[in-house]
């Protein structure tokens, strides 16, 4: 059984949140009406919401309906399917999305007719007919008929009897979709997010509502997963990062009280959660609706202190974008950052991307890197040196990268790292910084 329950909830300025109907009748839906509606509903016309209710996933469609007869001329409906199968957002949309749209359309129409009369429902129906192409499928027609008649038991039976598509885990199209999201919305912040996910930390994404936030969660969970290896020296002790998807102030206690060893990732529109530093280890924040403007997020640690991507993160992102983008972007930026990092920070061109990436699925590529990371750590934990860091595309002098390696070794392999950098390694770094600064001042003096 794929679907546990179907729920219809409404909101208006006079009556507040209400669960209008649900099926089966013995299913406990207490409190779900607050989760079915996103924060800032007055600013949204419609959207898809994905969240956990009683540790089960729920996919819902929210709609804002406007008519002079409504309280403050606005009435809100949300129809949710509580799922029993443990799938991610992308799979849920493909599997149930179109079906849920038809059900939500019919139930909203029937609710308007019941509460506000024929005129309001006809206005809503005409708007939907012009904005959506209705399917001629007998299945969808029967769904809408049951929805319009508020036959929840019939809807539930039809949903249970339908054979939904079985989806592949790693498709090329999915990889391309993730690549677009990474380039447009994450930028160099991606590598910081990816590293914290590998460390199984608590991660919070804060932005105005956008379905692609759920896709970012799906992507990070998959990219940070580690497949079980045949190598007995690499035990897999942790599960994938736990996705909570959409959360709000009502979920604060759940997030604080959980003891998930595998960490979690969630998104919210409640910016006040950014001030609750004990709630998360890493927060990505898109201020002032900038998520839709293709701007990169600000990054905050658990002390609510803003951090910025390292030079190596910039190098790796430039390399990644070089392979993922199709606009023929110049590699000058990559060269500039590589030279700066090589001669000032003692790294080399061992980036997290290489020529092999061109012929690989992005999801497979990062899972292969994760396996390589554990293999190198398992072999060299007792004597980890500069060359080992460079092999992994990490900065041997950057404190966040060193902390990353130490934590990965501890939580995945239960080993402590024994750093072997050489007695005078720090002198090399200082001398190179001095040399680079001198060259910069000399060039500046010549230019002036």
Swiss-Prot record:
Keywords: Endoplasmic reticulum, Golgi apparatus, Membrane, Transmembrane, Transmembrane helix. Residues 183-326 form the cDENN domain. InterPro entries: LCHN/Anr2, Lipid_Metab_Assoc_Protein, Tripartite_DENN. Its main location: Golgi. It is a single-pass membrane protein. It is found in: Golgi apparatus membrane; Endoplasmic reticulum membrane. The lineage of its organism: Eukaryota, Fungi, Dikarya, Ascomycota, Taphrinomycotina. This is Uncharacterized protein C119.16c. The keyword Transmembrane applies. Residues 4-155 form the uDENN domain. Pfam families: DENND11 (PF09804). PANTHER family: DUF4484 DOMAIN-CONTAINING PROTEIN (PTHR28153:SF1), PROTEIN, PUTATIVE-RELATED (PTHR28153). GO terms for cellular component: cytoplasm; endoplasmic reticulum; endoplasmic reticulum membrane; Golgi apparatus; Golgi membrane; lipid droplet. Residues 328-428 form the dDENN domain. The chain crosses the membrane at residues 425-447. It comes from Schizosaccharomyces pombe (strain 972 / ATCC 24843).
């Amino acid at each position: 059984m794929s679907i546990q329950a179907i729920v219809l909830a409404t909101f208006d300025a006079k009556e507040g949140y209400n669960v209008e109907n649900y099926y089966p009748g013995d299913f406990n839906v207490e409190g779900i009406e607050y989760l079915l509606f996103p924060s800032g509903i007055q600013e949204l016309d419609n959207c898809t919401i994905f969240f956990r209710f009683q540790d089960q996933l729920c996919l819902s469609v929210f709609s804002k309906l406007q008519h002079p007869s409504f309280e403050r001329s606005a009435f809100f409906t949300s129809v949710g399917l509580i799922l029993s199968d443990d799938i991610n957002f992308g799979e849920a949309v493909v599997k149930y999305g179109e079906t849920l749209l038809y059900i939500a359309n019919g139930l909203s129409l029937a609710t308007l007719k019941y509460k506000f009369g024929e005129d309001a429902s006809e206005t809503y129906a005409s708007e939907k007919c012009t904005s959506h192409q209705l399917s001629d499928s007998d299945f969808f027609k029967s769904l809408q008929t049951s929805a319009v008649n508020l036959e929840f038991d019939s809807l539930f039976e039809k949903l249970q009897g339908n054979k939904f598509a079985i989806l592949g885990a790693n498709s090329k199209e999915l990889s391309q979709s993730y690549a677009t999201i990474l380039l447009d919305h994450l930028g160099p912040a991606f590598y910081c997010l990816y590293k914290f996910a590998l460390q199984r930390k608590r991660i919070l994404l804060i932005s105005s509502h956008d379905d692609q936030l759920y896709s970012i969660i799906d992507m990070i969970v998959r990219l940070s997963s580690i497949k079980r290896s045949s190598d007995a020296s690499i035990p897999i002790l942790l599960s994938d990062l736990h996705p909570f998807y959409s959360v709000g102030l009502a979920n604060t206690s759940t997030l604080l009280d959980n003891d998930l060893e595998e960490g979690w990732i969630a998104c919210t529109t409640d910016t006040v959660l950014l001030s609750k530093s004990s709630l998360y280890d890493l927060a990505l924040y898109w201020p002032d609706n900038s998520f839709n403007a293709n701007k990169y997020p600000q990054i905050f640690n658990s002390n609510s202190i803003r951090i910025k991507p390292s030079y190596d993160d910039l190098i790796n992102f430039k390399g990644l974008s070089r392979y993922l983008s199709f606009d023929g972007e110049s590699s000058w930026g990559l060269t500039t950052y590589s030279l700066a990092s090589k001669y000032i920070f003692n790294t080399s061109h061992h980036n997290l991307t290489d020529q092999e990436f061109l012929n690989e699925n992005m999801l497979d590529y990062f899972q292969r890197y994760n396996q390589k990371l554990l293999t190198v750590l398992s072999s060299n934990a007792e004597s980890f040196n500069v060359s080992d860091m460079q092999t992994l595309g990490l900065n041997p002098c950057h404190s966040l990268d060193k902390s990353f390696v130490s934590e990965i070794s501890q939580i995945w392999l239960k080993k402590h790292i024994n750093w072997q950098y050489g007695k005078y390694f720090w002198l090399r770094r200082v001398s190179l910084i001095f040399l680079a600064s001198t060259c910069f001042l000399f060039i500046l003096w010549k230019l002036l």
